UniProtKB/Swiss-Prot annotation:
Cofactor detail note: Binds 1 lipoyl cofactor covalently.
Originating species: Bradyrhizobium diazoefficiens (strain JCM 10833 / BCRC 13528 / IAM 13628 / NBRC 14792 / USDA 110)
PANTHER family to which the protein is assigned, alphabetical: GLYCINE CLEAVAGE SYSTEM H PROTEIN (PTHR11715), GLYCINE CLEAVAGE SYSTEM H PROTEIN-RELATED (PTHR11715:SF3)
Alphabetical list of HAMAP family matching this protein: GcvH
Subunit structure: The glycine cleavage system is composed of four proteins: P, T, L and H.
UniProtKB keywords: Lipoyl
Domain Lipoyl-binding residues, every copy: 19-101
Full protein name: Glycine cleavage system H protein
């Protein structure tokens, strides 16, 4: 079963076992506008919670995407390098950024469920 959680920095995590798939929320992409470039983390990179992991650039701004948990990057979404605009059309689906092996599941405790995230962005 997949559990989806959200950060206050507008990232989502789809959690399956000890692996989280990470991307930015639809709210975040709507604030950014048309996405033109994405820099993804390197495979095998060790990330600490709240560390800048990726960069998303739009016609409006460049923003960091932060690691929502401590862990190792297992996979990146190479389709985003070729087609960064996927973030605008499917931010919470095909446009995931990276998968991370969760080092400490207790770090998930500070994240929001969908209802809390909707209240956060209202």
């Amino acid at each position: 079963m997949t559990t989806t959680l959200y950060t206050s920095d507008h990232e989502w995590l789809a959690i399956e076992g000890d692996v989280a798939t990470v991307g930015i929320t639809d709210y975040a992409q709507s604030q950014l506008g048309d996405v033109v470039f994405i820099e993804l983390p390197k495979l095998g990179r060790a990330l600490k919670k709240a560390e800048a992991a990726a960069v998303v650039e739009s016609v409006k701004a460049a923003s960091d995407v932060y690691a929502p948990v401590t862990g190792e990057v297992l996979e990146t979404n190479d389709a985003l390098a070729a087609e960064p605009a996927l973030v605008n059309s499917d931010a919470q689906g095909k446009a995931w950024f990276f998968k991370i092996k969760i080092a400490d599941k207790s770090e998930l405790g500070g994240l929001m469920d969908e209802a809390a995230y909707k209240a956060h962005t209202a």
